[in-house]
Amino acid sequence: MRTGVRGIAVAAAMVVALTGCGDGEGTEAVTGNDAVPGIAEGKQKVPPVTLDEAGMIKALPLSSELTHGTYGAGDPVLVQGAETAKACLDTLEVECPGVKTASKKDLALVGSSSDTGATFALFTFGTEEEAAAVLRTLEKHKKEFDGPSGRYTPVKVESGGADEWFAIERKDFVGVYMRIGTVLSYVITDDFGREGAEGAAQLQVGRLKVVAGGGDPDA
């Protein structure tokens, strides 16, 4: 799992996101309190990145922001309350203790008979520790999963500012899974290629941080 904290200007984040460039260096998976900066060192933490219900929808990318083709978007879905844990389990295929709210949007290439498209999903948790624990469980699950289509291959991508992340690939599928504060982000792509998936992940991180900071990513 990759870990790191990067302050990025909004303009730079959007440029990087739309170009889909970068090749990160991998690190060992983070476990325990070391997964959340400041806890292991005993430092006072700044409030973590989080999103309210409106932000969970606003932070999801727009179809017009994907530049390699024309994409149509389904209506974004927001899940709250008792249904959230099931929605998280159904999407991530692992239990999600502490999950509070979920949102999701599908984007598909217009006029294509292929499966080219992307899915963006966000999950907020009560604490960074809860979000980090679910991300570690998810990474372990994906590395061990062996289905009819074969195993996933870990790949290196640059997230554009997530606290922790990992990415996997299988045939035309690339998935990027990230934690930004108390939010888990899930970006999966079909027929985008690794660089296209990386760009989609960076786009998601850029929008999320703008919304969490009280800004409008579409202004």
Locations of regions flagged by a protein language model:
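Short Gly/Thr-rich strand-loop-strand
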Residues: 40, 45-46, 50, 73-88, ...
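Short, hydrophobic/aromatic-rich segments at coil-to-beta transitions
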Residues: 98-108, 159-167
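Short, well-ordered beta-strand elements
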Residues: 119-121, 182-191
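Extracytoplasmic/secreted envelope proteins and their assembly/folding machinery
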Residues: 57, 122, 131-135, 174, ...
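Bacterial N-terminal signal peptides that target proteins for export
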Residues: 1-10
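A short acidic-to-branched-hydrophobic micro-motif
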Residues: 102-135
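C-terminal motif of bacterial Sec signal peptides marking the signal peptidase cleavage site
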Residues: 16-20
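N-terminal "mature-domain start" segment
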Residues: 22-105, 200, 205-219
